[in-house]
């Protein structure tokens, strides 16, 4: 079993990656929408 610190760091890293990808997707959608409106 991993230590408490390892488990916290691992779960935080995974959640952080999901949040980063979600934000990037939202930004890409906003930029695409701006270009489509022209």
From Swiss-Prot:
- Residues in the signal sequence: none
The UniProt transmembrane annotation reads: 7-29
Q: Where in the cell is it found?
A: Virion; Host membrane
Listed A to Z, the keywords are: Host membrane, Membrane, Transmembrane, Transmembrane helix, Virion
A Pfam family of this chain: Inovirus_G7P_1
- Domain of life (superkingdom): Viruses
Gene Ontology cellular-component annotations:
host cell membrane; membrane; virion component
Topology versus the membrane: Single-pass membrane protein
Family to which the UniProt record says this protein belongs: Belongs to the inovirus G7P protein family.
Q: What does this protein do?
A: May initiate with G9P the virion concomitant assembly-budding process, by interacting with the packaging signal of the viral genome. The assembly-budding takes place at the host inner membrane. In turn, G7P and G9P are present at the end of the filamentous virion that emerges first from the bacterial host.
Q: Identify this protein by name.
A: Tail virion protein G7P
Q: Which organism encodes this protein?
A: Xanthomonas phage phiLf
What would be the name of the gene that encodes this protein? VII
